């Protein structure tokens, strides 16, 4: 089942009262103060229901369970496309995983395969809640901050929400991590950024030290890149002033199963249309150039970066460096899906509005991340298209 419901009004995202928390596994609705009680009681009482896996008097399991409890990963935006894949990956490794998501653009169904996992704690709540953030960071050994406004369509439609939802929660998380560090507890953090921060930089290939070049403030399209650039400045300021172990990753067109086309993502839109026999709609002339990387490659890079101390305090491009035009992508999707669909062209003004500007070429330099962790993407474009098409086909009655 695909998901991607529209973002609810701003007041639904920026309430300062603590939300109810859904502690998965026993179906109870938890209030925020109950989390700590359940956690500590669960370690003492193997029979009480709780957020964490219970320690049972089995000598063959205790060492394994203690090892699991030693690493708790918090994923903000964990029911989203990338976050849900990351949660699965970390659970397979043996981590305890806390997912927090307000389900504004994420979808709980993305976690359906792991929702009953004994080491997963799913919490429906907003990370602009001070008490919630303090509680969850206090329980975590590392943080993957993925929650953000997503998709060009959403950004063009709701620039206020884009800016506020990108900047305020990041500042709140960093401030709390700084307070914890001052008390002697440093928690590594990965901050998810985006290739959008490069803006209109005219270079053929973008490296991490290149200038960020944005358009006019009268064009809402740039609000996303600017707000994520502010996130980066904040993160690196906390590294410089407080020595926090933070790494920033700029994602370049991450694709794969569970990604929805509801917010303008091009590959799922193309694949869904091709399988349904509908026209594939290409914006402008289709000569915009992008590089697509599979989510499985990306999450492995993210985990390696947060586990590499030398990566702290630096920014990394994360993606593929194999370019393809959007028009050629549409043709490739039609070919790989054996579709009879046609290609139709649509102007930006019809797709978005008169103020919209696009980026003609977006290709990353991956030398820095290769030097740091040996990263090279393993899946080619045909494999990526096939994996997305297989997902859609399996969901079609």
Model-derived features: where do they sit?
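Short Gly/Ser/Thr- and charged-rich N-terminal loops/segments
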Residues: 4-6, 20, 40-41, 54
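Intrinsic-disorder-associated, low-complexity terminal segments enriched in Asp/Asn/His/Tyr and depleted
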Residues: 12-13, 22, 34, 45, ...
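Alpha-helix boundary/capping motif
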Residues: 13-16, 27, 37-38
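N-terminal amphipathic/hydrophobic targeting modules at extreme N-termini
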Residues: 20, 31-32, 48-51, 56
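N-terminal Rossmann-like NAD(P)+-binding domain of SDR-like oxidoreductases, especially those catalyzing
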Residues: 65-252, 379, 388-391
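The catalytic Tyr-centered alpha-helix of NAD(P)H-dependent dehydrogenases
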Residues: 216-227, 251, 259, 263-267, ...
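Hydrophobic alpha-helix immediately C-terminal to the catalytic Tyr-X-X-X-Lys motif of short-chain
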Residues: 230, 234, 238, 270, ...
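C-terminal substrate-binding subdomain of Rossmann-fold SDR/epimerase-dehydratase oxidoreductases
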Residues: 253, 274-397
């Amino acid at each position: 089942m695909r998901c991607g419901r529209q973002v609810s009004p701003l007041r639904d995202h920026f309430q300062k009262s603590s939300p109810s928390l859904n502690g998965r596994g026993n179906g109870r609705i938890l209030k925020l103060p109950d989390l700590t009680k359940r956690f500590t009681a669960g370690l003492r009482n193997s029979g009480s229901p709780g957020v964490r896996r219970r320690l049972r008097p089995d000598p063959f399991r205790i060492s394994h369970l203690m090892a699991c409890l030693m690493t708790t990963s918090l994923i903000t935006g964990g029911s989203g496309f990338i976050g849900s894949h990351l949660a699965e990956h970390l659970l397979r490794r043996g981590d305890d995983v806390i997912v927090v998501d307000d389900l504004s653009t994420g979808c709980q169904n993305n976690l359906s395969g792991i929702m009953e996992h004994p080491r997963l704690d799913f919490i429906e709540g907003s990370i602009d809640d001070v008490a919630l953030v303090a509680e969850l960071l206090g329980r975590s050994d590392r943080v993957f901050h993925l929650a953000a406004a997503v998709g060009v369509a959403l950004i063009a439609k709701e620039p206020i929400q884009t800016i506020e939802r990108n900047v305020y929660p990041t500042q709140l998380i960093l401030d709390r991590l700084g307070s914890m560090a001052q008390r002697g507890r440093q928690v590594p953090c990965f901050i998810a950024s985006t290739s959008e921060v490069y803006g209109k930089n005219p270079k053929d290939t973008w490296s991490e030290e290149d200038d960020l070049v944005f358009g006019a403030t009268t064009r809402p399209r740039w609000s996303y890149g600017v707000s994520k650039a502010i996130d980066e400045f904040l993160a690196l300021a906390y590294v410089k002033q407080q020595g926090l172990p933070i790494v920033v990753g700029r994602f370049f067109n991450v694709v794969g199963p569970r990604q929805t086309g509801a917010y303008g993502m091009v590959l799922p839109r193309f694949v869904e249309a091709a399988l349904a026999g509908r026209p594939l709609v290409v914006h402008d002339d289709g000569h915009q150039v992008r590089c697509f990387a599979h989510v499985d490659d990306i999450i492995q890079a993210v985990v390696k970066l947060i586990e590499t101390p030398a990566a702290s305090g630096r920014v990394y491009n994360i993606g593929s460096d194999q370019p393809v035009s959007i028009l050629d992508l549409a043709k490739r999707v039609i070919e790989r899906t054996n579709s009879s669909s046609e290609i139709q062209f649509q102007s930006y003004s019809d797709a978005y509005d008169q103020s919209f500007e696009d980026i003609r070429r977006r290709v990353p330099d991956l030398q820095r991340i290769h030097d740091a962790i040996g990263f090279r993407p393993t899946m080619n474009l045909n494999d990526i298209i096939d994996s997305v098409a297989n997902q859609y086909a399996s969901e079609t009655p």
